[in-house]
């Protein structure tokens, strides 16, 4: 079986090799003829027409590809001829060389194909990038142009508005708005025409027409009258504006004065109410003290509290400003001479009134008499009166000064040497208390 296969193969090679050799000869002749025709064609063809860059680029590309294909075909045909020649030699060395050469040719063909593909693709990418760049540049130019136009329009509008405002301000300053002169001239022309028509129709009392001079005089008088009217109107308008402005100013001043006056009246009314309240509390305290002094001497002490006195301290007076009732027996009531002596030696006493009404803002005698607060703070709750400089005894009730009825003064501590204490005390540093006490005793 192996021998039969060898015979068939030998026969096939014989017949196929002859056929292939004939075809290859014909093919070679055809390729050489093609090359000769292409070499002769440039001399025969006419000059090319004007074409675009893209078309010319594509044509050049096609020509290069066709030339490369023809060259590769020629090289392949030569290689095939050499291979067929080498097949006749049956040496293995030549066969190895032929195989290596074929592999080398195949690699070259692959490299050429790869380079063609790469060049074509790179050219395509470059053209695409160039188109994109051109589009971007155009778009940027368009957008920038629009932005510049828009900015220019806005600036022009702003400038126009600023110019209009400036013209209005200048017109208001000069009080000559634009177009007043024009209106004034037009009104004057219209008035002149009316006056001429009126004068043409006027006649004298005897139905005789007026002369030219008389007509001109009438027109002039009417013009003067119209000018006077306009001046009077302008004067009235300007004075009205000035009067309105003055009235506004006066109204604002009047409102301010009214507000101040109302505030002062409110404060005064509050002060008066406080004074009325304090004056109402006075007579109640005085009536209570008078009743205690006017009680009959023969009245039994059993009805009264047995020798009990309520001694109120300064802290209790401050906490409860109400009047304090003091009950004393009849046999302890002092006579008139004792009262006079005690008045001469006693000091002003705090009346049972609220301390709030005796503040600087509410006191009615703040401009007349001023007593120091140190007297109020240093004064004790008990007042001791010296009887002939021997025995000291607390007073049954606190004496009241007749001259200082409007003041609440704290009780004072009287020492054995009364002259030293009383000589030092004074009211507003005008008169000493001893002289004042003497005058009160004489009264």
Curated annotation (Swiss-Prot):
IQ domain residues: 113-138, 139-161
Major site of localization recorded for this protein: nucleus
Molecular function as annotated in GO: calmodulin binding
Pfam families: DUF4005, IQ
Record's keyword terms, sorted: Calmodulin-binding, Cytoplasm, Cytoskeleton, Nucleus, Repeat
Top-level taxon of origin: Eukaryota
Biased composition (Basic and acidic residues): 48-64, 277-293
Tissue expression from the record: Expressed in hypocotyls, cotyledons, leaves and petioles.
InterPro entries: DUF4005, IQ_motif_EF-hand-BS
Residue ranges of the region described as Disordered: 44-65, 277-361
Assembly with partners or alone: Binds to multiple calmodulin (CaM) in the presence of Ca(2+) and CaM-like proteins.
Family: Belongs to the IQD family.
Protein name listed in UniProt: Protein IQ-DOMAIN 11
Organism for this UniProt entry: Arabidopsis thaliana
């Amino acid at each position: 079986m192996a021998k039969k296969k060898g015979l068939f193969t030998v026969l096939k090679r014989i017949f196929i090799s002859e056929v292939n050799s004939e075809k290859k000869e014909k093919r070679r002749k055809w390729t050489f003829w093609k090359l000769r025709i292409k070499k002769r064609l440039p001399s025969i063809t006419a000059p090319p027409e004007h074409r675009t860059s893209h078309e010319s680029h594509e044509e050049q590309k096609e020509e290069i590809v066709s030339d490369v294909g023809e060259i590769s075909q020629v090289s392949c045909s030569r290689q095939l001829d050499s291979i067929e020649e080498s097949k006749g030699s049956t040496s293995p060395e030549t066969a190895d060389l032929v195989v290596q050469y074929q592999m080398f040719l195949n690699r070259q063909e692959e490299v050429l194909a790869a380079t063609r593909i790469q060049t074509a693709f790179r050219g395509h990418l470059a053209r695409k990038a160039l188109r994109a760049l051109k589009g971007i540049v155009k778009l940027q130019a368009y957008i920038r142009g629009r932005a510049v136009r828009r900015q220019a329009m806005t600036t022009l509008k702003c400038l126009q508005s600023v110019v209009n405002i400036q013209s209005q301000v200048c017109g208001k300053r000069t009080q000559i708005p634009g177009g007043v002169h024009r209106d004034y001239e037009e009104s004057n022309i219209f008035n002149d025409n009316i006056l001429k028509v009126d004068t043409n129709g006027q006649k004298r009392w005897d139905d005789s027409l007026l002369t030219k001079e008389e007509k001109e005089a009438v027109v002039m008088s009417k013009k003067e009258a119209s000018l006077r009217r306009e001046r009077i109107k302008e004067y009235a308008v300007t004075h009205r504006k000035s009067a309105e402005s003055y009235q506004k100013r006066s109204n604002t001043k009047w409102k301010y004065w009214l507000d101040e006056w109302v505030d002062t009246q409110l404060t005064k009314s509050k002060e008066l109410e406080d004074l009325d309240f304090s004056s109402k509390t006075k007579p109640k305290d005085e009536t209570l003290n008078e009743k205690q002094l006017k009680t009959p001497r023969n009245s039994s002490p059993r009805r009264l509290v047995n020798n009990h006195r309520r001694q109120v301290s300064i802290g209790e007076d401050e906490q409860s400003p109400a009047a304090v009732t003091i009950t004393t027996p009849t046999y302890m009531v002092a006579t008139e001479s004792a009262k006079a002596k005690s008045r001469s030696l006693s000091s002003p006493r705090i009346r049972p009134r609220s301390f709030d009404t005796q503040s600087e803002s509410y006191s009615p005698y703040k401009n007349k008499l001023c007593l120091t607060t140190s007297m109020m703070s240093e004064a004790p709750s008990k007042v001791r009166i010296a009887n002939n400089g021997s025995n000291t005894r607390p007073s049954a009730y606190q004496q009241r000064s007749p001259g200082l009825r409007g003041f609440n003064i704290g009780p004072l501590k009287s020492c054995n040497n009364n002259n030293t204490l009383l000589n030092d005390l004074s009211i507003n540093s005008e008169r000493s208390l001893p002289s004042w006490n003497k005058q009160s005793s004489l009264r």
